[in-house]
Structure formats: C-alpha cells, structure tokens
UniProtKB/Swiss-Prot annotation:
Record gene name: glyA
Its biological purpose: Catalyzes the reversible interconversion of serine and glycine with tetrahydrofolate (THF) serving as the one-carbon carrier. This reaction serves as the major source of one-carbon groups required for the biosynthesis of purines, thymidylate, methionine, and other important biomolecules. Also exhibits THF-independent aldolase activity toward beta-hydroxyamino acids, producing glycine and aldehydes, via a retro-aldol mechanism.
Assembly and interaction partners: Homodimer.
Keywords assigned by UniProt, alphabetized: Amino-acid biosynthesis, Cytoplasm, One-carbon metabolism, Pyridoxal phosphate, Transferase
Annotated site residues (Plays an important role in substrate specificity) in this chain: 229
UniProt-recorded Gene Ontology molecular function terms: glycine hydroxymethyltransferase activity; pyridoxal phosphate binding
PROSITE patterns with a match to the protein in the record: SHMT (PS00096)
Cofactor(s) needed: pyridoxal 5'-phosphate
InterPro entries: PyrdxlP-dep_Trfase (IPR015424), PyrdxlP-dep_Trfase_major (IPR015421), PyrdxlP-dep_Trfase_small (IPR015422), Ser_HO-MeTrfase (IPR001085), Ser_HO-MeTrfase-like (IPR049943), Ser_HO-MeTrfase_PLP_BS (IPR019798), SHMT-like_dom (IPR039429)
Entry protein name: Serine hydroxymethyltransferase
CDD domains: SHMT
Alphabetized SUPFAM superfamilies for the sequence: PLP-dependent transferases
Catalytic activity: (6R)-5,10-methylene-5,6,7,8-tetrahydrofolate + glycine + H2O = (6S)-5,6,7,8-tetrahydrofolate + L-serine
Length: 415
C-alpha cells in the first residue's frame, strides 16, 4: 500500500516492513479462519482517517468534550444504520470488541454471582459465555449446555431441562464454532419458561442475519451483541442491540461502566460497513459465503474427512482430522506449510487437550471476499485433502502450493 511507503517507512521502517510483510501474507495465502475477513478499501480508509484524533466520551448530543459535532454525525449514522439492518429498537456502537459488548450486557442486566447459562466452550461456545478463564466465568455462576453426542447438534429438550433445573437469570445463545442454524424461537420459549433473560451473541452470523440467510434473533432476544469484523466485513469492533426498555442501562454499562472514550475512527468505519451491508451486493456476497461453505464441506467429506454434524448451514464447519491420522494442531501446521490458514479447534466430546484438539475450524468469508466460488472451492478442498493425506511428501506439498498460488493469483486482494 503506497501510503505505508510514503508516510510510515520514513519514520518507522521496522513497522513499515512488518505491515508490508503482512500485506504479502494476506495476498499469498488463502484465509480460512472463520472469524477473519478482508474489509473494503472504504472501511479501511475511514478507519485510517482524522477521526482517530477526536476524544468523545459520552453519546451524540451528550458528550463530555467539545468539538464533537462531526463525530456525532458519524456515530448517529452508525447507530441508525445498524438498527435499520436488524430492525432493532436501540443500538450502542461504542464497544471496542465483541468481548466488551458481552461484558457490558452482563453488567447492565445482572449482579455478580447470578447465574448465566451458556454453550460449553468445548462444544462450540465462546470464552465470554462463561469460561472460567474469562471475566464472565469469574463474576457469575455458570451453567452450560452443549450438543448431542450422536447428532452433534443442540438438543433443545435437554437445554430446556437444564434451564428449568438451574433457573438461570440469563441464557446466552450463540457460538464460535457451531455450524448449524440456531432456533431463537425455541431459546425464547425456554428462557420464558425458566424465567430468564435471553441474550444472543450473533458475532459469527451477523452478516448472514443481515442478508436474511439465518433467522434473526432480534424479535426474540432481550439483548443481541455482535462483532463487526467477521461476516459483516467491517473493522474490528462490537455493538449491542436491545429493546428500548434496556437502552439506558446498556449505554451506561458501556460508558462509564467498562469503557472510557469511544474509538471514533473505528465507529466511522463501522458506519461505512453498515452502509455496505444495506446493499443488494452485500446480500449476494452473503449467499456466496453460504454456498461456498456448503460446497467445501461436501468436497471435504467426499475426500475422506469427517465434518462435524455432517455439514454446515452457515459460513463455517468443524473438520475432524482423525480419519487422516492427525490432530488439529498438526493439521493446522501442515496447511500453513502450503499457504492455507486455519485454526485448530476442539470438536464436541474431544479427547484431546485444547492445545492439541482433534479438529480444525474452516470458514469461507475471507475467501469469498476474494471472489472464490464453486469450482474454486473444490480445488481448495483438493489441496487440503492432498496434503493431509500425504503430509510427509514434499512433492505433494508442492502440488498443493501450486493450487493455492493459482487461486491467489486469480483472485488478488485490493487490486
């Protein structure tokens, strides 16, 4: 990128070199990490703008600093657009991350020591849904639910039984590694029966929800959180949607509760991202993500890999690599050696340690942003299975690298 050469390199050549190498890495490798994506140039430019210079504690029209008239415009645009996308009553776009958005929801609605029921991390949940190493697991009493051993899908009757026994104050629906549709209507019914609030973390599926390709949680949930940088294809950040009755508590939980000044350059980029998400092109892009995931999952299964739950309904899949005599850690390293990036990931009822795992998580948002489709995904599956089958063969690795290079050359980034 020319501006790195022009502005950064003369001042800090070490940082400039690292940025240039990262740009080359993104260009020359195929990104299959489900939580990563490539923003548009418009989003990137907004995030790199003079908005980074402005402090703006508070909310539009009620700041603790002067000179906020233009950052107010940007934040209002971001709030209005995200409410339009999801049909929400209230939005707060200030959370710096999905984790901070989730923490704000907990502290807006609960008292320390109350009970949260969330999806088990080892079954596809997220750290912020009650893991003992996270603040959510330290401040609150956690009860978890998971997937059925046979179907590897959420068993809603079992979930109901756990909820009625535990009587949590809040049920969290959402996941970081669950490839199937979430039934928010059932979650709502269970929450009502158990006397619990319903909080949905839609970080992974927000883009699909925006495009109407996954049921929306907004009509059912008391609170909805998300990141902006996964399927939404925006900057790294978070937001919260809620019913109007919770608006004041949510806003106060974000500021001054867990954050100080908002990152106005990031909020500007969020506003641009939300405008892009309102276009027909964005909906077509989300359909391509889902189609690509289905094609890739089918191709991997046809070539001897086991995909958890037998496929995917969304943008990601969990691949059990044990049929190839591998663990997730080794599979991740092998694929990295041919310029495909994935992450090792636990599969349900995984006998391996979290640092080893039996599977890998594979997602299609980033490769879809590069415009890969159909036969490209089948070629990608061929490269993956070639090298996992014969990972000790340098000849096979070279063949797989040629497949990856051809796809990268065909679909360059930021041309």
């Amino acid at each position: 990128m020319d501006y790195i050469q022009e502005y950064v390199k003369p001042v800090d050549p070490e940082v400039a070199e690292a940025i240039e190498k990262e740009e080359a890495r993104q260009n020359n490798k195929l990104e299959l990490i489900a939580s990563e994506n490539f923003v548009s140039r418009a989003v990137m430019a907004a995030q790199g703008s003079v908005m980074t210079n402005k402090y703006a504690e508070g909310l539009p029209g009620a700041r603790y600093y002067g000179g906020c008239e233009y950052v107010d415009i940007v934040e209002e645009l971001a709030r209005d657009r995200v409410k339009e996308i999801f049909g929400a009553e209230h939005a707060n776009v200030q959370p710096h991350s999905g984790a901070q958005a989730n923490t704000a929801v907990y502290f807006a609605a609960l008292q320390p020591g109350q009970t949260i029921m969330g999806m088990n991390l080892n079954h596809g949940g997220h750290l912020t849904h009650g893991s003992k190493v996270n603040i959510s697991g330290k401040y609150f009493n956690i009860v978890d639910y998971g997937v059925n051993r046979d179907t590897e899908r959420i068993d809603y009757e079992e979930l109901r039984e756990i909820a009625l026994k535990a009587r949590p104050q809040m049920i969290v629906a959402g996941a970081s590694a669950y490839p199937r549709i979430l039934d928010f209507k059932k979650f709502r019914e269970i929450a009502d029966e158990a006397g619990a609030l319903l909080f949905v973390d839609m970080a992974h599926i927000a883009g699909l929800v925006a495009a109407g390709l996954h049921p929306s949680p907004v009509p059912y949930a008391d609170f909805v959180s998300s990141t902006t940088h996964k399927t939404l294809r925006g900057p790294r950040g978070g937001f919260i949607l809620c019913r109007q009755e919770w608006a004041n508590k949510i806003d106060k939980a974000v500021f001054p509760g867990i954050q100080g000044g908002p990152l106005m350059h990031v909020i500007a980029a969020k506003a641009v991202c939300f405008k892009e998400a309102l276009t027909p092109e964005f909906k077509a892009y989300q359909q391509d993500i889902v189609n690509n995931a289905a094609i890739l999952a089918k191709a991997l299964m046809e070539q001897g890999l086991r995909v958890v739950s037998g496929g995917t309904d969304n943008h990601l899949m969990l691949v059990d690599v044990r049929p190839k005599g591998l663990n997730g850690r080794d599979a991740e390293a092998i694929l990295e050696s041919i310029n495909i990036t994935v992450n090792k990931n636990a599969i349900p009822f995984d006998p391996e340690k979290p640092t080893v795992t039996s599977g890998i998580r594979v997602g299609t948002p980033a490769v879809t942003s590069r415009a890969l489709k159909g036969d490209d995904m089948r070629e990608l599956a061929r490269a993956i299975t070639l090298v996992l089958d014969k990972h000790d063969s340098e000849e096979v690795k070279e063949e797989a690298r040629r497949i990856v290079k051809a796809l990268c050359d065909k679909y360059p980034l930021y041309t």
